[in-house]
């Protein structure tokens, strides 16, 4: 439950950081 949700939140945060730093990459591949 909570641990999985926390990991998902971390993944979303990392994706946000990456997409904000590299907005020109093709993220449709992810």
UniProtKB/Swiss-Prot annotation:
The keyword Secreted applies. It is found in: Secreted, Extracellular space. It comes from the Eukaryota. Hemolymph. One of its GO terms (cellular component) is extracellular region. Signal peptide: none annotated. Belongs to the tyrosinase family. Hemocyanin subfamily. This is Hemocyanin subunit 2.
